[in-house]
Amino acid sequence: MTAITNIAAREILDSRGNPTVEVDVLLEDGSFGRAAVPSGASTGAHEAVELRDGDKGRYNGKGVLKAVDAVQTEILDAIGGMDAEDQVAVDEAMITLDGTPNKARLGANAILGVSLAVAKAAAETAGLPLYRYVGGVQGRVLPVPMMNIVNGGAHADNPIDFQEFMVMPVGATSLSDAVRMGAEIFHTLKSALKKAGHNTNVGDEGGFAPNLPSAEAALDFVMESINAAGFKPGSDVVLALDCAATEFFKDGAYHYEGEGQTRSIEQQVEYLAKLTEAYPILSIEDGMSEDDWEGWKLLTDRIGNRVQLVGDDLFVTNVERLARGIETGTGNSILVKVNQIGSLTETLAAVDMAQRAGYTAVMSHRSGETEDSTIADLAVATNCGQIKTGSLARSDRLAKYNQLIRIEEGLGAQALYAGRSAIRQLAGR
């Protein structure tokens, strides 16, 4: 009944107009699953490999026909007839078939598309929503959104070096209430930027991308907008940053090209510490570069007791790198991106390892997204309590928020909004 009978794949476009892989899986009983794979702009060097065609005469070399072909030939031959309900076996079969440590032969985009589509088909067979199929009856925590309302770095064409400035509505009463709060802050910020003579164009993830001179200038606008929208910073809403520091770490120092400054490792740590003292910043992602383990440790020792320090490029949803972080006390949270590792099984393993070690986990989108809302279900399934899925603009971002609203409605009285408990450094305050 749940045997995989057919797999189809195609090349579709993501939110940046670049090709990505979409996969359909059909089971013996007629159940069907479809998944589309996201793509990042600022990618960690240790991520699983996204297979691109390299044909400059087609999509500027970014086509994914090789990955599509891999799905419909080798992967179908390998897992056709397997039980879709045995997710681990299906994923392990594809990983073994690939035969490389980073999925470079078949492509993480090929393997992940199949992995997620198989899970969706199995959920349909079981008559369950995906979050319930993956998470069981315990999957009922609605995550606090990290809403990216100002974009910089690789996600925008402006002088701001940090990549994301986010608001987290920890004081909301529910997920739908959190979405309302975020939307009101977003529109208030738009008015404030326009009044000050700044453009209100948006970046890849739907946040505004004004020409501001520094992180402090961006944070000041965000704080002003929170207050003007009628919320209390630090209580109703806290701030989060994604520095994406790997993008501006060169020759052992952090080069802020937009600001025209260079900071040593020690100066970078102190700069971030001062920002957290001046603003209600409760979460910093990639404050140090992906291989600056020394800097990461210094930052953790300096502010880790009061700020969530999220490893994205540092951990790349990889249990081996996460294990090193846990062993050395580096960071205290992991950003979870399904396409960084390339299968559902490995994604869930990373979340489980983090939670067992007392680290938090943040389910995340990529800057190149589609209408696929799988990560919304996975955030609830894993009870991770936090999700990062962009701003309150662009339908590729709103697809995830809208799915969370539907999940909350479906859970009814069982639904539990994570709120202040999502960030351990905040829960005790």
Curated annotation (Swiss-Prot):
Keyword Cell membrane: no
InterPro entries cross-referenced by the UniProt entry: Enolase, Enolase-like_C_sf, Enolase-like_N, Enolase_C, Enolase_CS, Enolase_N
Residues the record marks as active site: E205, K337
Record keywords, A-Z: Cytoplasm, Glycolysis, Lyase, Magnesium, Metal-binding, Secreted
Pathway(s) served: Carbohydrate degradation; glycolysis; pyruvate from D-glyceraldehyde 3-phosphate: step 4/5
Catalytic activity: (2R)-2-phosphoglycerate = phosphoenolpyruvate + H2O
EC number(s) stated in the UniProt entry for this protein: 4.2.1.11
Cofactor(s), names only, from the UniProt record: Mg(2+)
Keyword Flavoprotein carried by entry: no
Enzyme class: lyase
Residues at which Mg(2+) binds: D242, E285, D312
Record note on cofactor: Binds a second Mg(2+) ion via substrate during catalysis.
One family name in Pfam for this protein: Enolase_N
NCBIfam families xrefs: eno (TIGR01060)
Function: Catalyzes the reversible conversion of 2-phosphoglycerate (2-PG) into phosphoenolpyruvate (PEP). It is essential for the degradation of carbohydrates via glycolysis.
Name of this protein: Enolase
Organism for this UniProt entry: Methylorubrum populi (strain ATCC BAA-705 / NCIMB 13946 / BJ001)
